[in-house]
Amino acid sequence: MKIVIDGNIGSGKTTQLGLLEQKGWTVRREPIDKWPLKEFYADPTRWAFLLHMIILRTLRPLKTTKPVIYERSLLSSRWVFWPVLKRQGHVTDVEHDTYDHFYEQFSWSPDIYIFLSKDLDLAWEHIQARGQAGDEGVTREYLGELDAEYKKLIKSVPCLVFMVNANQTVEKIHQDICKILVENELLFRDAHGSQVQKSSSRGREVPCTPFPHVCNLS
């Protein structure tokens, strides 16, 4: 079971992944320590193709039938970040064709896609305040271009898609994500054969995942 939490830069993915990890979920973060982000932002034409080839090899799903929450997926690499780079002239036609060839080999689709939708101004403020590695190369204009591509992507993601208002408080965003996970527990049972637990609060049966805290629907 592959659950992806996606969103523009500065949408709050890292914070939410941390909260879910604290509750017992297996979380797979973007391995940005393996990516030449600093070099890319300094010279995107030189590093765009290499960066995205590295992403293809490192942003891979775990070999498990248990639910895993992933920070982004190759979908955003191919259909959000890559189109912006191509439009800006940072990749050649040969690089584009080569990348597409390998993308077809390494691509994978999530079972559930949760998108954190955050206003650009708020995302920009968050980026400036947090000082995360690689943020120094992000501009407000670039953020806007990514936002436009994300709006196209979420219309064609090949799985269940859920939009979460990321302009809310951290706590409310977390509640909304947990609600999505609880309401889709039937998919988790199909993935790893979980037992079924009675729910007295709603008078129906729900599958109990390996994480007891998400079995409580009260």
Regions found by a protein language model. Give the residues of each.
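Hydrophobic anchor at the beta1->P-loop junction of P-loop NTPases
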Residues: 5
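A glycine- and Lys/Arg-enriched "phosphate-lid" helix/loop adjacent to the NTP-binding pocket
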Residues: 80-149
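Conserved lysine of the Walker
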Residues: 13
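P-loop (Walker A) phosphate-binding loop of NTP-binding proteins
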Residues: 8
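NTP-dependent small-molecule kinase module
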Residues: 124-200, 208-211, 215-218
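Conserved substrate/cofactor phosphate-moiety recognition/catalytic segment
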Residues: 21-61
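Glycine-rich phosphate-binding loop used to anchor ATP phosphates in small-molecule kinases
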Residues: 47-107
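Hydrophobic positions on the alpha1 helix immediately C-terminal to the Walker A/P-loop
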Residues: 16
